[in-house]
Amino acid sequence: MIPRYSRKILKEIWEDNNKFQIWLDLEILACEAMEKLGQIPKGTSNRIKKKAKFKVKEIEKIEEKTKHDVIAFLTNVAKYVGAESRYIHKGLTSSDILDTSFSIQLNQSSNIILGGLEKLSKSLLRIAKKHKYTLCLSLIHISEPTRPTWI
């Protein structure tokens, strides 16, 4: 995103910190589901959730070596979770995480944009009603008057 054209709230959605937080949330949700299915020991997902965190700068350094964003992320999270990190990402592919997180980010962005469009449409309606009977005359190159577009 080009910073000067980006709204802060939308920029934050697409920053690495939010992306990695979504990845972590998805991995924890997968652990919770596997626990309910009896595929991992009971209580594991809660212990993982309590310990799980990441550091963006560390992930970037790891990715320089691994050339793989998800492996770099998982390596960093494993550092904080410890031995039970072996259950994180179990049965998942990188695409499972990447595609799902991308759709979540799109949804987050869409909600912000739709909220803005709703405000815009209300403003346009208010202006249109206010100027419904406002006369507006213009001459362009000495031709007959035409009605210009407002705004």
Please annotate each region the language model reported:
Residues M1-L139, S143, R147:
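A helix-coil-helix interface module used to build multimeric assemblies
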